[in-house]
Amino acid sequence: MNIATLIRYKKGTYDSIWNGNSWFAHGNIVDIARHYGVGLTVIATDGDYEKVCQMCDGLIIPGSPINIDPSFYGQEPFDPRNEVEEYLLDSKVIAAFDKMGKPMFGICGGIQALNVFYGGTLERVSNLKTDALAENPSSHIEEEQRVDRYGNTVEYHTHPINIKKDSFVFDVFQSERARTNTYHGYALDRIASGFDVVARSDDGIVEAFECREKKIYGTQWHPELAYRLNDPLELKFFENFFRVCKENAR
């Protein structure tokens, strides 16, 4: 089985030939693919996504440091505009996988890309730790220090979510209540037609949706951090998604 994912852009300083702006594949997703013995193909340019779609069984749309420009969902654009518009490639890749009826899983910015592609909108939210605490000292977001599998200390921001039964999120947590990480400044506003909201935070922010007919799933948080933090529970999101991709390919 082979899964596709998208390259992401990171702006850096030009201290040497090895530094500066760079393109990267999300390391946690690479590690998870290795963990399950799944092939992973990274889509980097407009020139190869259709061919990759044909050879892959599903698509993981990762999060990104870059927010989708509001002009893509009918609102005033950023000022200044993004240096790089990743959504231009994201939307083409989503269209190709949609046309071929292949499963997709969007994570953080990935769920936002799916929502915008299928006709939904986004809104700015104060859901980052610093923003939330500045506006509300009793914020539902908690911070803890976690040590990852590489010995690094991670600032882990979490909050509670409410989960709909008979959903892909409930399939993992087996509960209507769970704590997940949270690292986003935008959230889903109007939900794209055909998608069911299956998890919300206590303040009403959409945390997950799905379209079972199209086999499309999305989380506003980062379940891929589970591998880095040695948490086997949320790895089941990927295990279950890979199973859906395998069954769909038959």
Identify the residue ranges that each predicted region occupies:
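Conserved beta-loop-beta connector loops within the AMP-binding
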Residues: 168-175
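An extended, acidic
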Residues: 177-178, 185, 190-198
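N-terminal beta1-alpha1 cap of cysteine-dependent amidohydrolase-like domains
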Residues: 1-105, 109, 116-120, 129-168, ...
